[in-house]
């Protein structure tokens, strides 16, 4: 086993993003793990095969194979499932199409997978802010991504920096829900289901990827929309397991948390970073209530996100 060649696929879902070129170039420049054979799967989610020319133009620069797959309909779950369906490797990594990887990114993810035996490994995402980003956003680092621990374990995850062990029992046949492909939250749902099926999720703290924060995302309004949608996903997952009095309790608890955080935001008014962090938590818990009540989820993928997706 240690001396066998590992086959690793890297899935990149894309939708009209020229930044994909830098993502692919960063993969070409990274250190390849020992005894590993790599392949990149680019899943183009645009109605037209708009990324094909970019991928074909970069193909001569790539030290490993690229599989371009056109999977239209502007539904991110279709693109993610396309990567799953076309993966033949021992592992499948996921990366966003506006990110660049550090030199040892894949090596670190693979080391953690080997030492922990986890079904999935997550890495951190470091946000890079432009000069027009508010000071509170930079100081509070509101856009970087890390996993969340609950009672000492990671119970859900994200696809912006992840490695999946394809033969893990908790992942066999698992797919991203098409119903969440425009609203988002499909990755939270995917990893939550994997964890509930017995799959463990590990964290590789040195497996860094880097993500620029475009100007249209460097606002409190954009973050609030994102947090509300995240809350909706969490509320929907809670609603699937709770009914009657338990459902009422969850709604009351989310309301209390939202109220507490809103009050804390007012009390922290002099500190913009603390004030906005509490305000965003209040919005998240309001989203949980929305999800518990089954209200329509915000759409964040597809034509409405052309300039920022």
Curated annotation (Swiss-Prot):
Which keywords has UniProt assigned to this entry? Cell inner membrane, Cell membrane, Exopolysaccharide synthesis, Glycosyltransferase, Membrane, Plasmid, Transferase
Pfam families to which the protein is assigned, alphabetical:
Glycos_transf_2 (PF00535)
One example of a Gene Ontology biological process annotation: polysaccharide biosynthetic process
One GO CC term on file: plasma membrane
Task: Cite the annotated pathway.
Answer: Glycan metabolism; exopolysaccharide biosynthesis
Enzyme Commission no: 2.4.-.-
Q: Which GO terms describe its molecular function?
A: glycosyltransferase activity
Membrane topology type, per the record? Answer: Peripheral membrane protein
Q: Which InterPro entries match?
A: Glyco_trans_2-like (IPR001173), Nucleotide-diphossugar_trans (IPR029044)
Q: Where in the cell is it found?
A: Cell inner membrane
Read off the Gene3D superfamilies from this record: Spore Coat Polysaccharide Biosynthesis Protein SpsA, Chain A
Q: Does the keyword Protein biosynthesis apply?
A: no
* Family designation: Belongs to the glycosyltransferase 2 family.
Q: What does this protein do?
A: Glycosyltransferase required for the synthesis of succinoglycan (EPS I). Needed for the addition of the fourth sugar (glucose), catalyzes the formation of a beta-1,4 linkage between the third acetylated sugar and the fourth sugar.
- What protein does this entry describe? Succinoglycan biosynthesis protein ExoM
